[in-house]
Design a protein with these regions (language model features):
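Short, Lys/Arg-rich, polar N-terminal cytosolic tail immediately upstream
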Residues: 1-13
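Hydrophobic mid-bilayer segments of alpha-helices in multi-pass membrane transport proteins
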Residues: 80, 105-107, 136, 140, ...
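Early transmembrane hairpin of solute transport permeases
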Residues: 20-169
């Protein structure tokens, strides 16, 4: 039955290969479940609620992609660029509440869905040069890298130059640099789940050396605190138009750039 639906033989694969690929993809994406709540909690979101929402949304999106796309599925999860914009730009920078930000995300998502189901999607994507599609993803990656460097302590705020070199003697910076380098080495060696392995390994080192705090294996009961907790009225106000447009812009072009990159690597451009 699965072979008939997913066409394993036609695509020269089998159930075992797909299971291994699925586990490898999970290990590659698992860090998002931890990083997304960390970033959004800086903007006032509840860590437990975001963790639960991230896990549920990712699972649902992957199931839909698997059964709808069939032979061309991709792993779907919250974007690591758009969450940083919400936390640091919308909530901290513009002083919106998490509920108002969630309302803006909902409206932007509805607009994204409408555009995706109409010819507008193809027109917009085909109008963008391939170099720009790839460049958008790279730009968002650099934005995230800058945030990561600041959290590590490698960079710091400067009132004149905006960014300056941090304290290189900070032990937390050395731990962060070690984790980053280890992830790159594992990536080059083709080790699956390099990001989550690096996070776990250096978290343990931080706990042992006293620079981290271990709160147990099981934290708290999954929280559904953000289920339908969006402020739609605020999201539809005139003051939120730029926020909604920016969220849609980031989401649409980040998706276009990512899918273009994945399709280019897998040889499925134009399919």
């Amino acid at each position: 039955m699965l072979d008939n639906y997913f066409k394993y033989k036609q695509h020269k694969t089998d159930f075992k290969t797909e299971v291994v690929a699925g586990v490898s993809t999970f290990l590659t994406m698992a860090y998002i479940m931890f990083l997304n709540p960390v970033i959004l909690s800086d903007g006032g979101f509840d860590f437990g609620g975001v963790f639960t929402a991230t896990a549920c949304a990712t699972a649902l999106a992957c199931f839909i992609a698997a059964f709808y796309a069939k032979t061309w599925p991709v792993g779907l999860a919250p974007g690591m660029g758009i969450n940083a914009f919400i936390a640091y730009g919308v909530c901290l920078g513009m002083n919106y509440t998490p509920e108002e930000a969630l309302g803006a995300v909902l409206v932007a998502g509805v607009v994204f869905l409408i555009v995706s189901l109409t010819p507008i999607r193809a027109w917009l994507i085909n109008s963008i040069p391939k170099s720009l599609k790839l460049g958008i993803g790279a730009g968002i990656g650099l934005f995230l890298a800058l945030i990561g460097f600041e959290i590590m302590g490698l960079t710091a705020d400067n009132p004149v130059t905006l960014v300056q070199l941090g304290d290189l003697s900070n032990p937390l910076l050395l731990l962060g640099a070690g984790a980053f380098i280890s992830m790159i080495v594992m990536e080059k060696k083709g080790i699956k789940g390099n990001i989550i392995i690096g996070i776990i390994a250096f978290s343990i080192i931080a706990w042992i050396t006293g620079y981290g705090q271990f709160n147990g294996v099981v934290g708290e009961v999954p929280s559904m605190s953000y289920l339908f907790k969006f402020d739609l009225g605020a999201a539809l106000s005139a003051s939120m138009v730029t926020v909604v447009f920016t969220l849609f812009f980031i989401d649409f072009f980040d998706t276009a750039g990512t899918l273009t990159s994945v399709a280019n690597v897998s040889g499925k451009i134009g399919r």
